Amino acid sequence: MSKIIKPYKDSELGKKEQVAQMFDTISENYDELNRVISLGIDVKWRKKVVEIVGKKKPKQILDIATGTGDLVLMMASLNPDRIVGLDISAGMLEVGKRKIEKAKLSDKIEMIVGDSEEMPFNDNTFDAITVSFGVRNFANLDKGIKEIARVLKPAGVLVILETSNPTKFPFKQGYKFYTNFILPIIGKIFSKDKVAYSYLSESANSFPFGEAFNNILQK
């Protein structure tokens, strides 16, 4: 089990509440900062997720930790019957709703404030479930994964997009330098929440990846 990393170490709130508070605070400039910090690569990764999901021709899609809705907007091109974006941060969802309205996709995409560990859906509801850069923010990873399995249809597809730590030189050293030093500096300069991007860096570095994460999924 990975170490529990929280945004605000001096707060008495649980991780779930802290994560919601943090993303509410940074929601308005999250998209712009995300493009800068990821060097735009996050867009390419999301396109790959859409490609994988599209092969299943899903009718019901759920995007967990949907944030400002980048992925649900892209998945609208798959023409499913229904797309639901779920997130614990109302602030992020408000930004996403404005983007969806601008794209005239409000009749296709539904945005819901909700907890990934206690989702308001029946068993076996979705043909496809996606989580992009969100599982490391789960307060209880095992519980969140079990809840995903509950609402996913038996023949459905789950696609999780997450950062991981490179293991080979020089990528390992370059990644650590960027995430430990450059990313927090960018966050402190441009973000309203000075600790948010330090948390995002720390949580990414401590989260299980590769075989370790696959073992969690297979439990």
Where are these regions (language model features)?
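A short glycine-rich, Lys/Arg-flanked "PGG" loop and its adjoining helix->strand segment in the class I
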Residues: 142-157
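Class I SAM-dependent methyltransferase SAM/SAH-binding core
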Residues: 60-64, 68-118
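Conserved alpha-helix/loop element of class I SAM-dependent methyltransferases that forms part
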Residues: 29-32, 38-59, 74
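A short acidic, Gly/Pro-enriched loop at the edge of an enzyme's catalytic core
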Residues: 117-128
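Hydrophobic beta-strand segment of the Class I
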Residues: 30, 129-130
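C-terminal alpha-helical "lid/dimerization" subdomain adjacent to the S-adenosyl-L-methionine
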Residues: 17-18, 88, 161-217
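Short catalytic micro-motifs in class I SAM-dependent methyltransferases
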Residues: 133-134, 162
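N-terminal auxiliary segments of SAM/dcSAM-dependent transferases
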Residues: 1-20
